[in-house]
Amino acid sequence: VILKMGPHKKNQCDYFIEIFDSHCNETDNHTLLQEIIENRKTFISNQLGESNIGNLADLFSTQAAKDIIGKQASPTLPKHYFLIEQVALRLFGCLLSCWTELEIFRTIKNSTLTIIQNADNAHHTYNSPVINEHFHYEIVADIALDTRLFHTEFCDQPLRLSDAIVLINIATFIKEHQWYEMLGMLNISSKGEHFILYQFNDKSAYPNIISSALINSAPTSRNWLFFDDFFQSSKWQPIHQSYSILNLECATKISTTLGKSQLMNKSSDDIEKSIFSSILDHKKVCEAIRLTVSGSKSKANFYLYLAQKGLANALKESGRDVVFTIIEKPAMVLFYQSMNIDTPEASPYLFTSAQDINKNGVVTYKGIWLLKNATLAFNQYNFKEYNVKIIGLRKLLRNH
């Protein structure tokens, strides 16, 4: 049945995904494709040796992967798995791309079924603060419990909030940036505390999600991405920023137990853990990750500005003072660097470490958002003035 394809490539792909998902449901094996990928991952990794193992995208792009996948059946998997692998490879060019499309299909399908089943109990009230006249922002305590519907640019129909955020994360982080590791952890995107920024239009009763971010509270800090082993290795170069302690004390309105000796000549790991442990009231601390911005490319920079402004205000209104976060978008980095140069004693962002992870010139930064200063900055500078700060520093850096 799997080999009976329609005349067009897209139709073939859609048809394959649909009947494959049906097969998984009938056999009660929803991780079949994941089993194939994990099996291939292990085999290829053993072929290459540990020193050559990158992320999934790198691993499945190697010559070793090309020589094996779709060409040599795995001796440890059922025979029909190899047929599935061959068809998936022919249609999608990569097993990881096929897995991505499968999760998109499942997200939309499951959301549609849930909406139909709970139509009588749906709660569609959208009351939240507004920024720049037309954009609403809020923090949702647990998106898994939210029954409201939202549009995304990745689906024609409205979806439940949790499914909309999962779909946005798949499209943004996995399809665009090839962070395929996230496919096995999509449940993280479907629950818990989240920030959302959205906008209504005249064409639908449901708003469009412009931005979202996952918020992790201090009690879960052991599981924060910020403190994950990958982000605490010696590859991260520490950044020593002037006035760090003064900024932290002013931002938290209380004294910390931090001393200068804990920051000087220390590794980024030591610096970041010292800062976290020094903050006396952990209810005022959180991590914000997976910041997404959706919409047309022409408005991408404006939406990124609004997302930061909305997130800073929302977190401050929720009682937070300090936010641990990881950023790499050049516009964000340049704006914070510019503000730190202009107002070093009122820094909106304390940079703690940096690394060019993919060796492509795009540096990823770790640091701490100080909400008192960040909200002042974003409420002081409109989008045009925000851009002037970014462009000005970019020109300055080019000339040096």
Where do the model's predicted regions map?
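Non-catalytic substrate-recognition and accessory regions of acyl/acetyltransferase enzymes
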Residues: 2-278, 397-400
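Extended aliphatic helical segments
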Residues: 1, 87, 130, 140, ...
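Acyl-donor binding region in acyl/amide transferases
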Residues: 230-361
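Non-catalytic surface loops within mature trypsin-like serine protease
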Residues: 217-219, 295, 371-375
